[in-house]
């Protein structure tokens, strides 16, 4: 019998076992159509009904208002980062970017060929261990939008409140924290999220955008790069990643059945607290320097006394059935990703291993 390990990968990430088992059961034939869902046309009545149901479920899960369009697009968050200025910034216009870690820097880089960038706040001087106070942000007078990254998977910092940016549209990358805690969607004008952390497999991205924004002219671009065109065609302007869409739908249904975002917020707080307590009570053997008020509940980086210990920890953890704990190459150390599908038992196993490792090598 195949053994399932605890997978702490930052993405592609662990998927709920019930979702995997249902997909396994339906692999050869889905919905009595005589074929797999990945084999049928996205234009069939069956798949179009599936797509509508998934959108309805996602709206229910996240509380998406009716005046927002919900798009399911091929690719991931990086693609959206390049499309934002093309769709919503006029030539020569400025966009404001809040830099809180590696991925907000990536968003800025992807947008920079198409819009003038104003960095309103930059946490790099502090080693990305805090989020600069809103009072010190240098917002532009006529910015096309303000962009933020809700959770930084590498440096482990997270916005706990939605920043007030006035009348300027607020855009947010929620790839690693969507559905992890309750948010008021109406406080954002556009949310995008690659699915491979909390929503499903890699290869599909959700975009939630205020419909009035779709009226902006933006810059010259093809239809395939135009959000309004995708909205008009119900995310079927081109052939979508149907199997990924289906798996996303199963994951959303699973989250609803488990109690919705409110329940996962409770679980995620409890899981993260276990790990942070172990770090903070280790007497410095494990270190996490992120300011307590902005510590991520999804991604927890930490360091041992030296790089040799980091490597030994990751190797022994893997042998113990705790997978993908090696930190990102940009930062090093160890990183535990605790997305919605990570069960409490996995975190308890990690914490037990941390205690054992410290006893043996501390």
Curated annotation (Swiss-Prot):
GO cellular component: cytoplasm
Keywords per UniProt: Amino-acid biosynthesis, Aminotransferase, Cytoplasm, Pyridoxal phosphate, Pyridoxine biosynthesis, Serine biosynthesis, Transferase
InterPro entries documented for this protein: Aminotrans_V_dom, Pser_aminoTfrase, PyrdxlP-dep_Trfase, PyrdxlP-dep_Trfase_major, PyrdxlP-dep_Trfase_small
Chain positions with N6-(pyridoxal phosphate)lysine modification: 197
UniProt function note: Catalyzes the reversible conversion of 3-phosphohydroxypyruvate to phosphoserine and of 3-hydroxy-2-oxo-4-phosphonooxybutanoate to phosphohydroxythreonine.
Cell compartments where the protein resides: Cytoplasm
Transmembrane feature ranges: none
Any single biological process term in GO: pyridoxine biosynthetic process
Subunit: Homodimer.
Family: Belongs to the class-V pyridoxal-phosphate-dependent aminotransferase family. SerC subfamily.
Protein name: Phosphoserine aminotransferase
EC number: 2.6.1.52
Upper taxonomic lineage: Bacteria, Pseudomonadati, Pseudomonadota, Gammaproteobacteria, Lysobacterales
Pathway per the UniProt entry: Amino-acid biosynthesis; L-serine biosynthesis; L-serine from 3-phospho-D-glycerate: step 2/3; Cofactor biosynthesis; pyridoxine 5'-phosphate biosynthesis; pyridoxine 5'-phosphate from D-erythrose 4-phosphate: step 3/5
Binding site for pyridoxal 5'-phosphate: 77-78, 103, 153, 173, 196, 238-239
A GO MF label: O-phospho-L-serine:2-oxoglutarate aminotransferase activity
Residues the entry annotates as binding L-glutamate: 43
Cofactor binding, per record: Binds 1 pyridoxal phosphate per subunit.
Chief location: cytoplasm
Needed co-factor(s): pyridoxal 5'-phosphate
Organism of derivation: Xylella fastidiosa (strain 9a5c)
Pfam families named among the record's database cross-references: Aminotran_5
Reaction(s) catalysed (UniProt annotation): O-phospho-L-serine + 2-oxoglutarate = 3-phosphooxypyruvate + L-glutamate; 4-(phosphooxy)-L-threonine + 2-oxoglutarate = (R)-3-hydroxy-2-oxo-4-phosphooxybutanoate + L-glutamate
């Amino acid at each position: 019998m195949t053994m399932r390990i605890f997978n702490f990968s930052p993405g592609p990430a662990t998927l709920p076992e019930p979702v995997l088992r249902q997909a396994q059961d339906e692999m050869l034939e889905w919905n009595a159509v005589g074929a797999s869902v990945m084999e049928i046309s996205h234009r069939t009545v069956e798949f179009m009904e599936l797509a509508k149901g998934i959108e309805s479920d996602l709206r229910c899960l996240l509380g998406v208002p009716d005046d927002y369009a919900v798009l399911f697009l091929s690719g991931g968050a990086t693609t959206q980062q390049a499309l934002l200025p093309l769709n919503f910034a006029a030539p020569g216009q400025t966009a404001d970017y809040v830099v809180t870690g590696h991925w907000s820097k990536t968003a800025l880089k992807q947008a920079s060929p198409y819009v003038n960038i104003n960095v309103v706040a930059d946490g790099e001087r502090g080693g990305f261990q805090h989020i600069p106070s809103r009072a010190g942000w240098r917002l532009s007078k006529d910015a096309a939008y303000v962009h933020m990254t809700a959770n930084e998977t590498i440096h482990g910092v997270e916005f706990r409140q939605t920043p007030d940016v006035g009348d300027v549209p607020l855009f947010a990358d929620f790839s690693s924290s969507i559905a992890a805690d309750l948010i008021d969607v109406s406080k954002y004008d556009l949310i995008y999220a690659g699915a491979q952390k909390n929503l499903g497999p890699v290869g599909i991205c959700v975009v939630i955008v205020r419909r009035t924004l779709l009226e902006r002219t933006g810059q010259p671009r093809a239809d395939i790069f135009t959000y309004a065109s995708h909205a008009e065609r119900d995310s079927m302007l081109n052939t979508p990643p149907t199997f990924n869409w289906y798996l996303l739908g199963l994951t959303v249904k699973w989250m609803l059945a488990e109690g919705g975002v409110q329940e996962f917020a409770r679980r995620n707080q409890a899981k993260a607290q276990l790990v942070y307590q172990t770090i903070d009570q280790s007497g410095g053997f494990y270190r996490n320097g992120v300011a307590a008020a902005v510590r991520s509940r999804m991604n927890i980086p930490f360091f041992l006394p030296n790089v040799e210990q980091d490597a030994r920890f990751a190797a022994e953890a893997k042998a113990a059935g705790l997978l993908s704990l090696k930190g990102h190459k940009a930062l090093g150390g160890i990183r535990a990703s605790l997305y919605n599908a990570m069960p409490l038992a996995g975190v308890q196993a990690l914490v037990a291993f941390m205690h054992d490792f410290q006893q043996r090598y501390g």
